[in-house]
Amino acid sequence: MAASNGEKSLIVSFGEMLIDFVPTVSGVSLADAPGFIKAPGGAPANVAIAISRLGGRAAFVGKLGDDEFGHMLAGILKQNGVSAEGINFDTGARTALAFVTLRSDGEREFMFYRNPSADMLLRPDELNLDVIRSAKVFHYGSISLIVEPCRSAHLKAMEVAKEAGALLSYDPNLRLPLWPSKEEAQKQILSIWDKAEVIKVSDEELMFLTGSDKVDDETALSLWHSNLKLLLVTLGEKGCRYYTKSFRGSVDPFHVDAVDTTGAGDSFVGALLCKIVDDRAVLEDEARLREVLRLANACGAITTTKKGAIPALPTESEVQSLLKGN
């Protein structure tokens, strides 16, 4: 399903883009942080840039505030080779901000400023349908499902992409502080579950969505549905597990000195989508899929070695050097 003009097919990422404020030192509370580094982020935007860094073709669809941060973020997308044609600017709401506490092990805790932020106010009639219809893969999360009108815009975009023949890719990217309750988060994340053909969840998200205290095959397969082509469970420093209709298995991690896990999952997803957009047969060939997932694990690992998501997303050459060294 390659693009007719010989260039790579388009992957469209839908959802939020925001500014993360990350403490200059790890292992302190937000109150005790001596200062913060401003880092662009937002999972769907991270995925789009991850794809572009690896040589893929990506576009982002979402809404930013018509403010300095919003225009800065749109500029960062363009600088990284991501099409910004699908971006709207809201004159009445600000670009979202998140303060991210880095624990000493590189894991994170979040405090969000979105009341409401521009991304929440994207309306169905503002969608750039031409961009969405051009997608061979349409990728999204669940944060855009939390409130209207963005929820309706999300559902419309999914429907349009699917009708145009796109592969639907879903990474729930659970951020509980943004939801009114745990129950609502679980309900809404699962409300669109059976639409996606590729789904990636973390081990923690797997336990949250199933109510299980185990991360095993039985728990993962309880989330399987008939439209799925690939279900992935990322295990952080333990690698990942994969499930298809015909086979299942696990791929070992790369061991690196993790500084900040922000964006690692997005980097993983970007690498996967980059490799399957023009070659969906990979999803039915276990040996080739394992190769792709090894590369995706390498991308995730490299991303943890620097602070912030977007600055840490690797290039193809960085990934190849890690692969060759292992």
UniProtKB/Swiss-Prot annotation:
Q: Which SUPFAM superfamilies match?
A: Ribokinase-like
Alphabetized, the UniProt keywords read:
ATP-binding, Carbohydrate metabolism, Kinase, Nucleotide-binding, Transferase
Q: Which Gene Ontology cellular component terms are annotated? A: cytosol
User: Which Enzyme Commission number(s) are on file for it?
Assistant: 2.7.1.4
Look up keyword Transferase and say if it applies: yes
PROSITE patterns assigned to the protein according to its UniProt record, in alphabetical order: PFKB_KINASES_1 (PS00583), PFKB_KINASES_2 (PS00584)
Annotated GO biological processes are: fructose metabolic process; starch biosynthetic process
A single Gene Ontology molecular function, please?
fructokinase activity
Please indicate which superkingdom the organism of origin belongs to.
Eukaryota
Pathway assignment: Glycan biosynthesis; starch biosynthesis
Mark the transmembrane ranges. none
Name of a matching Pfam family: PfkB
Q: Which principal EC class is assigned to this enzyme?
A: transferase
Q: Reaction catalysed?
A: D-fructose + ATP = D-fructose 6-phosphate + ADP + H(+)
Gene3D superfamilies reported in the protein's UniProt record:
3.40.1190.20
- Give the protein family: Belongs to the carbohydrate kinase PfkB family.
Q: What does this protein do?
A: May play an important role in maintaining the flux of carbon towards starch formation.
This protein is called Probable fructokinase-4
